A protein has these predicted regions:
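Clamp-loader machinery-focused feature within the broader ASCE/P-loop NTPase space
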Residues: 1-120
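Catalytic acidic motif of RecA-like/P-loop NTPases
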Residues: 112-118, 123-126, 130, 146
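Charged, glycine-rich active-site and insertion segments that engage polyanionic ligands
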Residues: 1-49, 64-67, 134-137, 143-299
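Conserved adenine-binding aromatic site and its adjacent loop/helix in ATP-hydrolyzing domains
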Residues: 95, 127, 150, 154
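Conserved catalytic/switch belt of AAA+ P-loop NTPases
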Residues: 98, 123-140
Length: 299
């Protein structure tokens, strides 16, 4: 059960939180920032285990730690919404946080996708952050802390989940999937994101997209624009997954040609976000990706 937590358990981010609690300098509210799959929820679970652990160290062995990790501890509360977090949602959290913890010294309140909270909901929470209950700790998980109100950010301690090294992700994948031959390659293609590494192992479709990204980059000098366009069109409905994989592969290569092609991919992402016709955007990417002409970036 605990193999999945080892990477984040030994991370600098968790160590900083652990040390702050041991030294009596814990914050009453944290913003844990990072892309999907970066380990935000795992960090919040481990921090919760640390807070309720009867050994005060996130031993992962005592009943309190186990219940916190399983999401069944009465003093650890996870708030998640498929839609934007509303004032009503936030008021429910605030009312719960006003109650005394059942067993632990603190109640822990984890808000997933906090960046989706409406301005009204954030202002509702702000009053609690300004005068926090002494026995409550809040953890706001967000893709980008900049999407939260400045007044909310100023009352929280920011923890950034940055990328892990390929080697650390490889070891984590090996622990999770003993004997799996794809662990090394998945770690290299994960781009520092453990969630993506896991998805590459578990989801055949994503692995095939990663293989397509590898082929496009490896054969870019010999492919014709028509061949590259055909390859891209075959994945036209999954560009939101393929283009980041292409970017990671080009960054990993790091040579002059790859970095130039990275610019073309970034331009394609921008064009798609601006609702340019997808077929035109992909055909343009295929042409400049294989020809290496910089004019497209100036259009």
């Amino acid at each position: 059960m605990y193999e999945r937590y080892q990477l984040v358990l030994h991370s600098r981010q968790f160590e900083d939180i652990r040390r702050s609690f041991l030294n009596g300098r814990a914050a009453h509210a944290y913003i844990i920032e990072g892309p999907a799959g970066a380990g935000k929820r795992t960090l919040s679970k481990l921090a919760s285990a640390l807070i309720v652990c009867r050994e005060k160290r996130a031993c992962l062995d005592c009943p309190d730690c186990r219940r916190a990790l399983l999401g069944v501890h009465p003093d650890v509360h996870l708030y998640s919404s498929e839609k934007r977090i509303s004032v009503k949602d936030m008021r429910g959290l605030i009312e719960q946080s006003a109650l005394k913890p059942y067993e632990a010294d603190y109640g822990v309140y984890i808000v997933e996708n906090a960046h989706t909270a409406t301005a009204e909901a954030q202002n509702c929470l702000l009053k609690t952050l300004e005068e926090p209950p002494g026995d409550s700790i809040f953890m706001l998980l967000a893709l980008n802390a900049g999407q939260l109100l400045p007044t909310v950010r100023s009352r929280c301690r920011l923890v950034r989940m940055t990328g892990f090294s390929d080697e650390l992700i490889f070891r984590q994948l090996q622990a999770l999937y003993p004997g799996e031959e794809k662990c090394r390659q998945a770690a290299q293609m994960a781009g520092g994101n453990i969630g993506r590494g896991v998805a590459l192992i578990e989801k055949r479709e994503l692995w095939e997209l990663a293989a397509l990204a590898e082929r496009l980059c490896a054969e870019a000098d010999s492919l014709s624009a028509a061949q590259a366009a055909e390859m891209l069109r075959g994945a036209k409905d999954r560009m939101d997954e393929l283009l980041p994989l292409l970017e990671e592969r080009l960054i990993r290569a790091g040579d002059v040609k790859s970095l130039a092609r990275l610019g073309y991919v970034e331009d394609a992402v921008r064009r798609l976000e601006e609702n340019v016709n997808p077929a035109l955007a992909l055909d343009g990417l295929a042409y400049y990706f294989t020809k290496g002409d910089s004019k497209w970036q100036k259009l």
